[in-house]
Design a protein with these regions (language model features):
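Long, charged alpha-helical interface segments
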Residues: 4-13, 193-195, 223-231
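Acidic, glycine-rich flexible loop/linker segments
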Residues: 144-217
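Buried hydrophobic positions in well-ordered alpha/beta secondary-structure cores of metabolic enzymes
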Residues: 21, 113, 171-173
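Intrinsically disordered, low-complexity regions enriched in acidic/Ser/Thr/Pro/Gln residues
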Residues: 1-71, 75-84, 206-214, 220
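General beta-strand structural signal in soluble alpha/beta enzymes
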Residues: 31-33, 91-93, 121-125, 139-141, ...
Length: 231
């Protein structure tokens, strides 16, 4: 990923990237995105962009493994996150879903992960401490709650499922208040141009609709241009 593409991705929202991927692929039907409504800790922040660092957690019940095993895995998890190639995004599956109760993402964990250089986090689980999270580290979560429960790390680095989206370690993630998606590797090289094409195509309708004397006849004309230009 080039610095120019990274800057482009941070400037646009996730729906724009969804559409731009289809422009790059030349067809409709891109489906590697989350389903349902997600919550964002900082909806006005730029989009979360980076390569996935994955893990699984649980919190409903106390861990059944020995405490030393849990502690060792916790340190392995933090080491794994600290060594992430940047830009990176923590993508964490709560295996208690849809009955998640343990907020893994609060003031402490967001501050730690931001300190490691990560750009944000995506989870099907719970977040909390919304007024105390550090600036510049958005979290996109399925829900908000007060407790951490018995939260503990179950697995590190394996493929995870986030609200219908399968994410593997190293996948390129784009996420914001609308949800998250995985950018296919085969469009990374053409995605920057696809974003520009999409935005210019949308302006055909938007610019006309914002002018005075916009009427149905004008709409028909610009919509025909729009249809010919879009994917």
């Amino acid at each position: 990923m080039t610095p120019s593409l990274l800057a482009h991705l941070r400037r646009v929202d996730t729906p724009t990237v969804c559409n731009a991927i289809e422009v790059a692929q030349g067809k409709r039907g891109f489906a590697a995105f989350t389903r349902g409504t997600m919550q964002c800790s900082a909806p006005r922040d730029p989009a979360i962009v980076g390569f996935a660092r994955t893990a699984k957690i649980a919190a409903l019940s106390p861990p059944s493994e020995p405490p030393e095993t849990i502690k060792a895995r916790r340190m392995d998890y933090y080491r794994y996150m600290a060594q992430a190639p940047l830009p990176a995004v923590a993508v964490i599956e709560d295996i208690d879903y849809p009955d998640c109760i343990g907020a893994y993402w609060g003031e402490i964990n967001t501050t730690i992960h931001k300190g490691f250089g990560l750009s944000g986090a995506v989870t099907n689980g719970v977040m909390r401490d919304l007024g105390d999270m550090p600036d510049g580290f958005p979290v996109v979560a399925k829900s908000i709650g007060p407790s951490h429960g018995f939260v503990h790390v179950r697995d590190i680095g394996s493929t995870v499922s986030i609200c219908g989206l399968s994410v593997s370690d190293g996948d390129l993630i784009h996420a914001d208040q609308h949800g998250a998606l995985v950018i296919p590797t085969d469009v990374i090289g053409s995605l920057e141009n696809a974003i520009e094409k999409l935005l210019s195509t949308e302006r055909i309708v938007l610019d006309a609709a914002q002018k005075k004397n916009f009427d149905f006849e004008t709409f028909k004309s610009v919509w025909d241009q729009f249809e010919k230009a879009r994917t």
